[in-house]
């Protein structure tokens, strides 16, 4: 009887199931962002701002915003970040993973301790990743090791959720910061993903003067006021 009812009301069933899936996805994104804000990757800091969609961090913003943000007086550097939803072997165990621009990321997060040869190797390999010491200890991954990551959110242009990457660098953080994360190349992510091309999750912005951080933040938001993707 239940199956018969579901068949008769396929559209309603589809939207019901879809709403449940979306609800769980949004919950996962919320938990992920909470983790990012509280973890060793301290997204916002004394000289760092986070710029995201005004409505919600689950709404994406255009990559084209980066050049306009860079042009604002007081901005030193910018990198995009997006929640990747990575998992390895067991989907229940999500690994905080963010596509970034490697060189800009390391300039903004200058406290990341990375051997120079590994830093250069990561920057040079578009499918390379940098992982934290804590994650390396948990997984046993070594520099040079190929890792088949999967994403619970992002499928590739070929329709699969498998992202083959190679560990190129392992970073440490001073004072016991959280090092259980993965940083991957924004260019690789943008080229290979099958949806939402040209959009990113949020920007991390480094400012030249901490005392003017609020002023810079307002200038950034004014740049995109009354646009389809206003920021905050």
Label every PLM stretch briefly:
Residues 21-98, 103-104, 114-125, 137, ...:
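Hydrophobic, regular-secondary-structure patches
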Residues 55, 60, 72, 135, ...:
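Mechanotransmission and gating elements of multispan inner-membrane complexes involved in transport
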Residues 81-82, 90-101, 112-188, 196:
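Hydrophobic secondary-structure segments that place a key small or acidic residue at a functional site
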């Amino acid at each position: 009887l239940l199956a018969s009812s579901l068949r008769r009301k396929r559209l309603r069933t589809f939207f019901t199931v879809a709403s449940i899936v979306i609800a769980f996805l949004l919950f996962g994104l919320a938990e992920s962002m909470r983790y990012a804000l509280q973890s060793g990757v301290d997204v916002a800091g004394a000289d760092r701002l986070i710029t995201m969609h005004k409505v919600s961090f689950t709404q994406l913003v255009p990559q084209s915003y980066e050049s306009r943000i860079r042009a604002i007086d007081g901005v030193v550097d910018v990198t995009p970040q997006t929640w990747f939803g990575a998992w390895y072997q067991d989907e229940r165990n999500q690994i905080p993973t963010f596509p970034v621009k490697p060189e800009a990321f390391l300039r903004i997060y200058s406290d990341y301790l990375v051997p120079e040869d590994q830093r250069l190797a990561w920057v040079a390999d578009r499918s390379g990743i940098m992982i934290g010491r804590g994650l390396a200890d948990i997984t046993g991954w070594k520099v040079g090791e190929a890792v088949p990551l999967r994403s619970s959110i992002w499928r590739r242009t070929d329709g699969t959720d498998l992202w083959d990457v190679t560990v190129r660098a392992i970073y440490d953080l001073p004072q016991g910061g959280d090092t259980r994360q993965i940083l991957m190349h924004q260019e690789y992510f943008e080229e290979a993903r099958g949806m939402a091309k040209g959009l990113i999750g949020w920007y991390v912005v480094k400012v030249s003067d901490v005392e003017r951080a609020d002023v810079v933040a307002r200038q950034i938001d004014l740049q995109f006021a009354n646009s389809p993707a206003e920021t905050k």
